[in-house]
């Protein structure tokens, strides 16, 4: 178990993301992190890596560039960034890895594709506390002037609360902030992962030379707002906190298959 980390002012915090080094969400996260600690490092992808999942670069060299004190961009995936930071760039490991703030929610099955979640997961695999933060964006827009305002306002409180409790060393914490006005936020709720699948709306198009290509859209086959899930809670304006385990073994199925081999 991770012991409670109650004094974040003494903590070393590593930030990463999947939207890229120049992303607005990372800038918001840096401001949040600096309200918690003075020892903040940023190691993020040089370019956007949304949907990269837990990909690791093993067939190409990893280029990195210093972008200021304790600030680096890496020409690689979010997973690469956390590995490079912890195993090469930093003189000692961070006390906390925070990934985000993603431009868009990471709810339900999103977590399997998300580079934001993968960066946090890599931190967990390295034996570190890790939190993934995502700000939900409605595709039809809500007219909110500052789309990151809920995350910017509540992220530090959520991080403090989570770090103030012990949790399993095989678990990362996935946090999603609702897309709503500040006064419409209903609270912070612990929820299990919901279900929603993307990638079923593959569209074939033609380029100017009349060659076919495919485009994977963001249309969800079904958003199941089942009670008790992150998706249902976010639809009510709640901030959701979902523990995710890196050990994906299903013990009941092991029991069910006992004797088959």
From Swiss-Prot:
Listed A to Z, the keywords are:
Cytoplasm, Hydrolase, Metal-binding, Nucleotide-binding
Q: Which InterPro entries does the record match to this protein?
A: SurE (IPR030048), SurE-like_Pase/nucleotidase (IPR002828), SurE-like_sf (IPR036523)
Subcellular localization: Cytoplasm
Chief subcellular location? cytoplasm
Look up the EC number in the record and give it.
3.1.3.5
Which SUPFAM superfamilies does the record associate with it? SurE-like
Q: Which Gene3D superfamilies match?
A: Survival protein SurE-like phosphatase/nucleotidase
Give Gene Ontology CC terms: cytoplasm
Q: Which cofactor does it need?
A: a divalent metal cation
Catalytic activity line of the entry: a ribonucleoside 5'-phosphate + H2O = a ribonucleoside + phosphate
Pfam families in the record = SurE
The EC class name is hydrolase
Cofactor note as given:
Binds 1 divalent metal cation per subunit.
For this chain, one GO molecular function annotation is: nucleotide binding
Q: Where does a divalent metal cation bind?
A: 18-19, 50, 102
Main function:
Nucleotidase that shows phosphatase activity on nucleoside 5'-monophosphates.
Which family, according to the similarity comment? Answer: Belongs to the SurE nucleotidase family.
The cross-references to NCBIfam families, in alphabetical order and at most eight, read: PRK00346.1-4, surE
Record's protein name? 5'-nucleotidase SurE
